[in-house]
Amino acid sequence: MGQSKKLNKQPSSLSPLVQLAGIRKCFDGKEVIPQLDLTINNGEFLTLLGPSGCGKTTVLRLIAGLETVDSGRIMLDNEDITHVPAENRYVNTVFQSYALFPHMTVFENVAFGLRMQKTPAAEITPRVMEALRMVQLETFAQRKPHQLSGGQQQRVAIARAVVNKPRLLLLDESLSALDYKLRKQMQNELKALQRKLGITFVFVTHDQEEALTMSDRIVVMREGRIEQDGTPREIYEEPKNLFVAGFIGEINMFNATVIERLDEQRVRANVEGRECNIYVNFAVEPGQKLHVLLRPEDLRVEEINDDNHAEGLIGYVRERNYKGMTLESVVELENGKMVMVSEFFNEDDPDFDHSLDQKMAINWVESWEVVLADEEHK
């Protein structure tokens, strides 16, 4: 959201590595992916993001060759791999369970794929140790999986996946089993490792924060379809529809009705009972219903007294939560709607905290809002 600034768009010079064209997949007669087209570029960290059952893991398994498409084509480096068996694709997968062999040492787990490929014996030790160095586990080579922490097991699984030097690494919710602190650490390590290796990563998650943190590009999915495809900043600041807006982070959705268009950019509208100017980049008519979307951190609040004449939306503080860097307040508007406001904490301001039931005026910087048509009344 926010200022009309250039977002961190992907460079257009990236070359395609994987192309999915017209992909359709059914399970037990139920269509889970009706028609999907997706291009994954060389060297990027792409995340498939969506709620449970949206089809993201199915897409991953189709790329890996663990499921077969009902129709459509999958290309890897301009080669049609639609019907190529999984073991013959230069693609490796790290599963949520890691799937390490418990009776083997870390070294043997990582070496397993090389032995299966009949790699010359003289190459195995240097390649395994190189992979373990990449994930900072070279001193753990002789340990068994049960002697490792969850984060270390995850890194062994990644080392085992990259030792074969795949063109593409697929990760299926592979951080979800870790505790919060370790998950944050592994997010940073995984992104740094991807940059170091230069391998294309495709990561599946339902965790929005994880996707925003790690990805070069995010593909938001729902019911087997792509809802939006863009950089993390584009997805967060310029959601294309209400589903994406509501799924990615906290957001306030205000109901609005068009009064009149003022100029090419601005529209006068009734927003939750108050007249405001909003920026609308599509054609509207008087009386048309709209949604005005604003992140909690994009709202500006001011304490007012009963006799103050204030601009903006008027409400009362019903909850306030100190979060360290921020103060989060829930403000109830005069029409009963609850609004979330997030302010950066100012320890030098003794009046920064708000009392419960304090009357507030809510405003925002013009053009920071995202305005969408009402999908029910188009």
Curated annotation (Swiss-Prot):
It catalyses: ATP + H2O + polyamine-[polyamine-binding protein]Side 1 = ADP + phosphate + polyamineSide 2 + [polyamine-binding protein]Side 1. It is found in: Cell inner membrane. The keyword Membrane applies. One of its GO terms (molecular function) is ABC-type putrescine transporter activity. Keywords: ATP-binding, Cell inner membrane, Cell membrane, Membrane, Nucleotide-binding, Translocase, Transport. Residues 18-248 form the ABC transporter domain. SUPFAM superfamilies: MOP-like, P-loop containing nucleoside triphosphate hydrolases. Its EC number is 7.6.2.11. GO terms for cellular component: ATP-binding cassette (ABC) transporter complex. The keyword Lyase does not apply. It is a peripheral membrane protein. ATP binds at residues 50-57. It is an enzyme of class 7 (translocase). The complex is composed of two ATP-binding proteins (PotA), two transmembrane proteins (PotB and PotC) and a solute-binding protein (PotD). PANTHER family: SPERMIDINE/PUTRESCINE IMPORT ATP-BINDING PROTEIN POTA, SPERMIDINE_PUTRESCINE IMPORT ATP-BINDING PROTEIN POTA. Part of the ABC transporter complex PotABCD involved in spermidine/putrescine import. Responsible for energy coupling to the transport system. Belongs to the ABC transporter superfamily. Spermidine/putrescine importer (TC 3.A.1.11.1) family. NCBIfam families: potA, PRK09452.1. This is Spermidine/putrescine import ATP-binding protein PotA. It comes from Shigella sonnei (strain Ss046).
